[in-house]
Each structure stands twice: as C-alpha cells, then as structure tokens.
Amino acid sequence: DVVQLIRGPNGSFVRLQIQPGNAPPGTQEHVLTLPRTKITLEAQAAKKEILKVKRGDKELKVGVITVPSFYQDYNARAAGDDEFRSTTRDVRKLLDEIKAEGGVDGLVLDLRENGGGHLSEAIGLVNLFVPKGPVVQLRETGGRVEVLESEDKAAAYSGPLTILVDRFSASASEIFAAAMQDYGRGLVIGQQTYGKGSVQNLYPLDRYALGQDPGYGQLTVTIGMYYRVTGDSTQNRGVQPDISLPSAISVEDVGESSRDSSLPWNRIRTSTFKPEGSLAPMLAELQRDHDVRVAGDADFRYTQAEIGAFESMRSEKSVSLNLEQRKADRERRTQQQLA
C-alpha cells in the first residue's frame, strides 16, 4: 500500500512526512519532497571510487566498488545486444579501469543494502576473483543437489580483497560473500547478513483458469534451499562477518529469522573445492588492530554511544503521559547525542 502511494506519473512530486525511527516521542516530523522519475539501470549500476589512505608514512590506494544489486539487462540480452549490461560485466569493466589507472593496493566490494538479484550474476562475480570451482549448492525439495560452478577463467583481480556487508545484504549477496569467505579469498566485514537461503519460483495462476482474462495473479512457491560449498545453509544464520562493525539494526527484528514461518537452518555434504588461501592465521591480529583503531576513533565511539542510547530507548516499555516530562526526556536524549 505504501509503495502504491509513493508511485505516480513521471515528473510529479511526492511528499513524505518522516520521523526517524530513533526519535523520542514528540519529535517534530520532517517533510521530504521528492520528484518522481523512472529508475534506470544506470542509477542502480556498480560504481567505483579510489581512496587514498594513510598508513604510517605510506599512502595506499584503495579501490571501492559499490554493487547495489545483482542485475542484468534481460531485455537487451534477449534482443541479441552483445553489449547488454550486467553486474559481472560492469564490475569487470571497473576492474579494467582500475588496472589502467595504475592499480590499487587493495579492493573493497561494498554489498551493503544489496538485497540480491540474479543468481547467475553472483556466480559470475565470484568468477572475477576465483578461477573455476563450485560457488553454491542448490537442493531441491525432492532432495536432488545441484552444484553451480563458475567458468574456467582467470581471475580479473588477485590482490587483497574486502567485502562489506550489513543486515540488508541478502540472497545473491550472501552467496557471493560466503564463497569469498569459504575460499579464503576475501575478508568479510560488517554485520551478520539477512539469512535468506530459500529458493522461490513464481507460478501464474491464470493458466488454470477457464475464463479469458481472470487476473488471478501468481503464487510464490519455495522450491529449494541454497547451501555454501562447505555444506552450511545461509538460511537464518546468513554470513557471519570476520570483523564486526557496530549497527543499530536489531538481528531479532530484521532478517529471515525474524519471520514467523522462516524455514530452519540445516546443512548438507561439503562440495569438493580448493581454497585460494586462508585468512584464519591473521584474523586474531586483524581483530586486535581493529579494536585499537575503534578505541581511538571519535566517530566510532560516537556511533557506539548512539547505538547504546537507541537500544536503551527501545527497551523502555512505557512513556510518560505528562507533556513536560516527555519534553524533558527528549531534551536529555538530544544532549546525550550532542555530547
């Protein structure tokens, strides 16, 4: 219903009355006016940025590629366009540009808020960093297991790799992050991912109707489960990061495990695969370095304090009916945020 209210003619405007989720009672709402326009593939496409990071007396170049979704221009591909856009093609192009610009000392793939998309693109993206090998296992409801593999191609990038994830990284994002983790190819940083390990298919109901145009819609049916090459499912548990970052998003409130009808986690046999390496020996040192950096970073401390204040406010089970008391509480929280 909300989506239908937001949608409208191209060029028109929609006004949204917004109150932040962590705002105390009585906070004034903000009105946000947005122009309606057609969402293009370009707006959702992968993008790159080169950051210069100081490390001691050295200046390192770090490439950051943001991947909002696992997309593919199906219409262009169906029309025979050899230059159709896709996540894998666009990221490879960005990697080629980075190489042409002198390369980088490390690469970050940002999959935060990436809710997934085409499975084939997740497999293709893995292939840019890992040569041929199994990427994900698919078990159907009847028990048959299919191992989906990447092609026999040389990796487009073989340097240090980090994958950023959050609680909204789901489905294809989890498949990619899990493969990078299992192959020891990249360090996963962020929050526990969404935990969507089930496979759905759409069945149009009109095919069973007798009328000309009944408009019965379609039915979404779960037909299987995804599993990592290790045999573990991503269902409910998602992908656990190697290094955790603070987040105000509650795992209990957001994610597949928060749903009443969520399927349980399970595992199957491990697929045969050869890890690219192992990050385990350096994880303890990385965690120590991370803890030291967080302790000395004012922005991190502020973020953690805000999260603590938000958790405290969310745990409150009652609100004062006295207006002056509510105003005083709001002012106190505001001062805490500014401190």
Stretches with model-predicted labels:
Residues D1-L210, M225:
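Cleft-lining beta-strand/loop regions that shape enzyme active-site pockets
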Residues N10, Q28, E59, F129, ...:
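A short, structural micro-pattern
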Residues P20, K38, P68-Y71, R167-F168, ...:
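A broadly conserved detector of short glycine/acidic/proline-rich loop/turn motifs that flank catalytic sites
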Residues L34, V62-I65, V91, V135, ...:
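Generic structural hydrophobic/aromatic packing signal, biased to beta-strands
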Residues K153-Y157, L210-G215, N266-F273:
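A general structural signal for short secondary-structure boundary/capping elements
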Residues G184, I189-V254:
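Polar, glycine-rich mid-to-C-terminal structural blocks
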